[in-house]
Amino acid sequence: MTTAIHSFTDLGTIHHRLSAGTYVITDPCYVFPDEMWSDLCDKIFCREDEGKECPESGVIEMDGHQIWWGQTAYGDGGYAVRVYGSKVGEFGVDAGLFAIFPVEFVKKYKPDLLEEKTLACTLSMPAGVVSYDGGDMDCGQVAVCTSSNDEDEEDEEDWGDDPDDNGGDSEDD
């Protein structure tokens, strides 16, 4: 018996209410069974020749669960999950998307993912409203930023601080 996606809602910039609970933040390609992944991709990724705008975020309802999802700003990579600004975990992205799954859903479809600390971040979240803007998600105390790279920002802050770096004016130049 194949389980199907019951509904798919394009939220755009509309906010989504999330109940308190334990959630997994990861790329949905790691969680959805193969037979559902292609159906989901047809709904999320638009072909330019169809003349439709692709949704940037939305909610999928399946098996009595609501799964919020959003596109990353720059595609694949590794992204931090922050609580009150402090990094509490990270997750990998291979499909340019990230989602907030109820842990029960992940336990049913991909329980091994809960052990993958670089592909998924599991955390308890209070009730809140998920907001999305250009690849960034905020839900009260929990935030994911994909529109800038934390490591790049740290590197930029440190640029020029190396005492051995004389700005390219070495005797060898």
Where is each model-derived feature located?
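Intrinsically disordered, low-complexity acidic regions enriched in Pro/Ser/Thr
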Residues: 1-173
